[in-house]
Amino acid sequence: MPGPDASLPDLVLRRLAISEQVAAAKFGAGRPVDDPVREQRELARVRVLAREIGLDPDLAAGFLSDQIAASKQVQHRLFTHWSAHPGDLPEGGPDLSVLRAELDGLTVALLDRLAATGSEALEPPESPDELQEPLRTAFRTLTRQRPAPGGSGNGP
């Protein structure tokens, strides 16, 4: 679980990094990426949590909706890759319920951090240069140990 000093971008990256494991669990179980019932339930839960901590429920739900959309993009890309290259699917897929519990904990941490930093944390940076390191970190997170298309799956 993230520490109390984890930054908002760090928490977003941690949540996004779990997307690959979620995709593997869903793909291995024959479940679709999209789960609109769970998504709506999570957005409703976030609205309640936001009210409890004094955060605008619409801001919180919009923020989580963006996190869900980013995760689904990663999952769809992996589903496409694994459909074409089934040998690249990680063996022994993770338990989706365990991953969802981890995501739920990250959601609470994200909301707490968002409430602590305020909505200005969601404002675009003044300079594109401010995005360089977070983007490099996100790229490394999403490509770490990822096989090249048609690769063996034995990344560095």
What is each of the regions a protein language model found here?
Residues 36-46, 63-71:
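Acidic helix-start/capping segments at beta-turn-to-alpha-helix junctions
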Residues 5-8, 28-36, 48-53, 89, ...:
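Second-shell loop/turn segments in exported
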Residues 1-32:
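Immediate post-signal-peptide N-terminus of mature secreted/exported proteins
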Residues 90-118:
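Acidic/histidine-rich alpha-helical segments that form the ligand environment
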Residues 53-82:
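Mid-length scaffold segments of soluble, non-membrane domains
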